[in-house]
Amino acid sequence: MVFKTIWIERYRKLINLFRALASCHGSNLDVEKPVVFKEDAASFGQTVVQFGGSRLVVGAPLEAVAVNQTGQLYDCAPATGVCQPILLHIPLEAVNMSLGLSLVADTNNSQLLACGPTAQRACAKNMYAKGSCLLLGSSLQFIQAIPATMPECPGQEMDIAFLIDGSGSIDQSDFTQMKDFVKALMGQLASTSTSFSLMQYSNILKTHFTFTEFKSSLSPQSLVDAIVQLQGLTYTASGIQKVVKELFHSKNGARKSAKKILIVITDGQKFRDPLEYRHVIPEAEKAGIIRYAIGVGDAFREPTALQELNTIGSAPSQDHVFKVGNFVALRSIQRQIQEKIFAIEGTESRSSSSFQHEMSQEGFSSALSMDGPVLGAVGSFSWSGGAFLYPSNMRSTFINMSQENEDMRDAYLGYSTALAFWKGVHSLILGAPRHQHTGKVVIFTQESRHWRPKSEVRGTQIGSYFGASLCSVDMDRDGSTDLVLIGVPHYYEHTRGGQVSVCPMPGVRSRWHCGTTLHGEQGHPWGRFGAALTVLGDVNGDSLADVAIGAPGEEENRGAVYIFHGASRQDIAPSPSQRVTGSQLFLRLQYFGQSLSGGQDLTQDGLVDLAVGAQGHVLLLRSLPLLKVGISIRFAPSEVAKTVYQCWGRTPTVLEAGEATVCLTVRKGSPDLLGDVQSSVRYDLALDPGRLISRAIFDETKNCTLTRRKTLGLGDHCETMKLLLPDCVEDAVTPIILRLNLSLAGDSAPSRNLRPVLAVGSQDHVTASFPFEKNCKQELLCEGNLGVSFNFSGLQVLEVGSSPELTVTVTVWNEGEDSYGTLIKFYYPAELSYRRVTRAQQPHPYPLRLACEAEPTGQESLRSSSCSINHPIFREGAKATFMITFDVSYKAFLGDRLLLRASASSENNKPETSKTAFQLELPVKYTVYTVISRQEDSTKHFNFSSSHGERQKEAEHRYRVNNLSPLTLAISVNFWVPILLNGVAVWDVTLRSPAQGVSCVSQREPPQHSDLLTQIQGRSVLDCAIADCLHLRCDIPSLGTLDELDFILKGNLSFGWISQTLQKKVLLLSEAEITFNTSVYSQLPGQEAFLRAQVSTMLEEYVVYEPVFLMVFSSVGGLLLLALITVALYKLGFFKRQYKEMLDLPSADPDPAGQADSNHETPPHLTS
């Protein structure tokens, strides 16, 4: 229990905190102390209406007041919080009317209309719901019922044909009894909508009167009296066929829309009839004829006779077949037949019409127009719906789309009702939420005393109930309707349910369309937002009407109410200004927001109130008083003096900048009866808000912020505070900003408990500027004198490709007065891009502040960058040096010279001079990376012999040229090849070059040295130093990136010249070199060696010997060597046999057993 008490207390504190925060943010309804009305009556709060400026009328339509009487109205007094039931004279015929299901008051509070659309009336066995309303006066006294009386029971059109048996089996007296029965039944069923006809049958079929003759007869009873019995056989089936084909025909007065009823009276089975029932009865069924069969006498005790009687009557037989013992007993079944026939009234058949107004439920919605009460009749014409207008003469006018409009079937037109006055024309607006399952709203106007549809707008989502609620709004209170709110409470989205469409009134010839759509809070898919709508009045002081919208299904049916402010004459603000929930007021409140009524001052405080219905409760929420606050700030002096903020070069001290005076003017934002209103005001002051470091501070707080809390009444309230400068000011161009943010927490007014809030248009923040005095001879105009120059930081040539950056050293100076917004702009080719800026390592009397950025120029070939210098002020006599660096693309093409321009400007608007513009050019080269290399498949070695007369062989030297640079360039490839040595041919060479675009020329060049033997000693190399050479030059005008070209030096290499060198081995050397325009290109640094290449071929001479002499000499030598070896071996005893002697010698090794084997035998092949 203690825990529960603590939890409730915390909950209350949390609610109060939320209420205080809501008040600070401009809520317009008081939720702290609402006026609460509570009754135990069933459905109390289902409807509510403000009436007479001092009372609430609340409906409880399900309250059982008495037998056959439901619905009660309550008169609730806001001053006491007490409700009293209103005693009314309810018409006796208004059975169970659900009084109060709709409530509406007229605009001048002189009349109130309370309706009960379920008022019932019994007609035979049918219950019709016609509806009924009560018109009440200004004192809630009964004036009249509308309609004045309940309408008579509807008369169903019926064509009733009698087929009576006139055969000879019936006595004359019984035949007379049968005629009396027919006359009595005609009397009971007679009405303006019922017609009769009669045919007698035996074996003769005779029509006594048709429907036409019956209608034209002045005495219908005499038509029956004149009938004479035919006598004869019984042709019952033939009689039925004749009735179907002839009597129920339009030529005899039968009506297509009428129900067709046939009453057959017979005393027995058919006899000798040529027709069978199986041929006749289907024809009657097809014609939609309801058949009643009456059997008279004992004949029908037989099963076959009874079966025939059941065949004549319609199914089921228990409802359509009657048996009596004699003709006198016919009277006993008159009432039964009458009830059976009356029971079919109001039902539909294939040939009958639908309901008209029997189930109209008049008063489902209602309005009080200039012409009289308007009652929505949703059930008229099979729930197509419409509305009844009851003028003073009480001759009602039914307003609908069309009685035969199938498109309106089950549309529920009249489910909601609203009035509009637009362009001098009174209009009626009706909602049809079930039209085509999506709903629509129709505007009706009166033309030539007929109400006709003028404009309509349709819903989009099936089942959304578009048009379930309507509210016409006069936004500017000029008496003319500006827009209509259309509730769509069952519109479904994943996170919220219901919406309201804001639809401005249509033009004369334009279509009606809706603009803004209002939604409730996310998280309530079954919220039914838009179930109730009302005009609240102007609660925020902007002279535009505000509206309240109920969402009774939010928060698990606890409910909520939203307040939306008017945005313009034709629109509502899309976001709510306040949301009041049922749980915020009472923990157990249910369906809060199911009904709404606003626009009147019921609490007599001069402010409009909002009545909100809930289940068993009605709450009156008062609007809060409005205050408008004006704010002004002024400074003294009007500028910060130069002597205060210019302190460079001296020790900084805190100096007084001036004073700021803040004035608040508090006045009422709307008229009320609350007298003087106190308000708790808090305002926060901030100096230089948004700056990292503020240039000024408050003397009181020694920082840049100051907060004040005061309780103020109506009038002017001022305060002055001192401002200080804590440091030297760099930015003396932009004024010091003082911003004030104000919040209002109004104190409760005496005896009213209402806290004022800020009205729309009140100042809750203001910004003021405190400028600096300018350092100028002429006030407001400074004469700066800027100059700019730069150099390329010692760079002589820009080599594109090897120099990725270009650094420019810039000097800027000001020889005049302070320069404001000093800007240096650089213009350079588009191939360069701004990289960074760096301060020079030089002392400055003022801190140097640089900020550079690239800027568009609008030209593809030109780029620009700008640098602000000491923004905002470049002081008098100041000088700044800095380096700006640009990225140079390795693919850049800048021509042969780079042009860089710079200009200095400021906000002083001084014209450009020769010092403010500077330009400089820098030579440009392009770094390339070209390679020439030898190929491995060149001829590397030749062996030759002079004695055999070898004079020449074919040799190849192969070279490959590659362009590894990103540029396409023009180059030349040079080859040097030895071709003569002292007049002797060396190499008859030709050059095979790539075919496309390569042209080659050649020339002969003499040797560099003439002393052949001296130069070749130790080198053994034949090159252009000692031989005549062929110089080949191939020009390549365009060598693309990554292109490669192959060159082949090929020809017959002679050997006759080698003898001049006195060498056995000589290295033949060719050379190649790449050349290009060095004023445009330069080889990549460190890669110069790849511009040259050599290919060598080793030439080696060998001696050839005679083979015969060699063979003879080798043979003789071999034989002599063999003889010498043989003699030597002989002398050494190699050819003597010593084995036998070895056997004869005693064994050197004794027998291991100590004695020789006596039985040992010498092998036979070793004996002598």
From Swiss-Prot:
<feature type="glycosylation site" description="N-linked (GlcNAc...) asparagine">
    <location>
        <position position="741"/>
    </location>
</feature>
<dbReference type="Pfam" id="PF08441">
    <property type="entry name" value="Integrin_A_Ig_1"/>
</dbReference>
<keyword id="KW-0460">Magnesium</keyword>
<feature type="glycosylation site" description="N-linked (GlcNAc...) asparagine">
    <location>
        <position position="96"/>
    </location>
</feature>
<dbReference type="Pfam" id="PF00357">
    <property type="entry name" value="Integrin_alpha"/>
</dbReference>
<dbReference type="Pfam" id="PF00092">
    <property type="entry name" value="VWA"/>
</dbReference>
<feature type="binding site">
    <location>
        <position position="538"/>
    </location>
    <ligand>
        <name>Ca(2+) 2</name>
    </ligand>
</feature>
<dbReference type="InterPro" id="IPR013649">
    <property type="entry name" value="Integrin_alpha_Ig-like_1"/>
</dbReference>
<dbReference type="InterPro" id="IPR032695">
    <property type="entry name" value="Integrin_dom_sf"/>
</dbReference>
<feature type="domain" description="VWFA">
    <location>
        <begin position="159"/>
        <end position="341"/>
    </location>
</feature>
<feature type="repeat" description="FG-GAP 1">
    <location>
        <begin position="28"/>
        <end position="85"/>
    </location>
</feature>
<feature type="repeat" description="FG-GAP 2">
    <location>
        <begin position="86"/>
        <end position="145"/>
    </location>
</feature>
<protein>
    <recommendedName>
        <fullName>Integrin alpha-D</fullName>
    </recommendedName>
</protein>
<dbReference type="InterPro" id="IPR036465">
    <property type="entry name" value="vWFA_dom_sf"/>
</dbReference>
<feature type="binding site">
    <location>
        <position position="478"/>
    </location>
    <ligand>
        <name>Ca(2+) 1</name>
    </ligand>
</feature>
<feature type="topological domain" description="Extracellular">
    <location>
        <begin position="27"/>
        <end position="1107"/>
    </location>
</feature>
<feature type="binding site">
    <location>
        <position position="542"/>
    </location>
    <ligand>
        <name>Ca(2+) 2</name>
    </ligand>
</feature>
<feature type="glycosylation site" description="N-linked (GlcNAc...) asparagine">
    <location>
        <position position="108"/>
    </location>
</feature>
<feature type="binding site">
    <location>
        <position position="476"/>
    </location>
    <ligand>
        <name>Ca(2+) 1</name>
    </ligand>
</feature>
<keyword id="KW-0472">Membrane</keyword>
<feature type="topological domain" description="Cytoplasmic">
    <location>
        <begin position="1129"/>
        <end position="1168"/>
    </location>
</feature>
<feature type="binding site">
    <location>
        <position position="474"/>
    </location>
    <ligand>
        <name>Ca(2+) 1</name>
    </ligand>
</feature>
<keyword id="KW-1015">Disulfide bond</keyword>
<feature type="binding site">
    <location>
        <position position="601"/>
    </location>
    <ligand>
        <name>Ca(2+) 3</name>
    </ligand>
</feature>
<dbReference type="GO" id="GO:0007229">
    <property type="term" value="P:integrin-mediated signaling pathway"/>
</dbReference>
<comment type="similarity">
    <text>Belongs to the integrin alpha chain family.</text>
</comment>
<comment type="subunit">
    <text>Heterodimer of an alpha and a beta subunit. Alpha-D associates with beta-2.</text>
</comment>
<dbReference type="GO" id="GO:0046872">
    <property type="term" value="F:metal ion binding"/>
</dbReference>
<feature type="disulfide bond">
    <location>
        <begin position="1029"/>
        <end position="1034"/>
    </location>
</feature>
<dbReference type="InterPro" id="IPR000413">
    <property type="entry name" value="Integrin_alpha"/>
</dbReference>
<dbReference type="Pfam" id="PF21520">
    <property type="entry name" value="ITGAX-like_Ig_3"/>
</dbReference>
<dbReference type="InterPro" id="IPR048285">
    <property type="entry name" value="Integrin_alpha_Ig-like_2"/>
</dbReference>
<feature type="repeat" description="FG-GAP 7">
    <location>
        <begin position="578"/>
        <end position="638"/>
    </location>
</feature>
<feature type="disulfide bond">
    <location>
        <begin position="663"/>
        <end position="718"/>
    </location>
</feature>
<feature type="disulfide bond">
    <location>
        <begin position="115"/>
        <end position="133"/>
    </location>
</feature>
<feature type="compositionally biased region" description="Basic and acidic residues">
    <location>
        <begin position="1158"/>
        <end position="1168"/>
    </location>
</feature>
<keyword id="KW-0401">Integrin</keyword>
<keyword id="KW-0106">Calcium</keyword>
<feature type="repeat" description="FG-GAP 4">
    <location>
        <begin position="400"/>
        <end position="451"/>
    </location>
</feature>
<keyword id="KW-0677">Repeat</keyword>
<feature type="repeat" description="FG-GAP 6">
    <location>
        <begin position="515"/>
        <end position="573"/>
    </location>
</feature>
<feature type="glycosylation site" description="N-linked (GlcNAc...) asparagine">
    <location>
        <position position="943"/>
    </location>
</feature>
